Amino acid sequence: MARKSLIQRERKRQKLEQKYHLIRRSSKKEISKVSSLSDKWEIHGKLQSPPRNSAPIRLHRRCFSTGRSRGNYRDFGLSGHILRERFHACLLPGATRSSW
């Protein structure tokens, strides 16, 4: 189980990302439209003005069950060991155990 502070920090980042999403997207479109280098630098300065944690690259996928940030499967939203436990308990329909 991940620490609760890490999970809360991730939720805060998600809220910030949603809040500044339109500002970032519009600034990136402006950069692609402008041809002069000085104007691009000005717009790039605007792009750096939102908080650092509002960048989408700083978000992590977390396991819904445990909050683990590593080894997640996007299709299920679970980490590897929780996914395996749920496969064995037949809680995920359509999944089969691999045997070799």
Curated annotation (Swiss-Prot):
Superkingdom field: Eukaryota
Family annotation (SUPFAM superfamilies): Glucocorticoid receptor-like (DNA-binding domain) (SSF57716)
Localization annotation: Plastid, Chloroplast
Keyword Chloroplast part of the UniProt annotation: yes
Family per similarity comment: Belongs to the universal ribosomal protein uS14 family.
Record has Magnesium as a keyword: no
Name listed for the protein in its UniProt record: Small ribosomal subunit protein uS14c
Protein purpose: Binds 16S rRNA, required for the assembly of 30S particles.
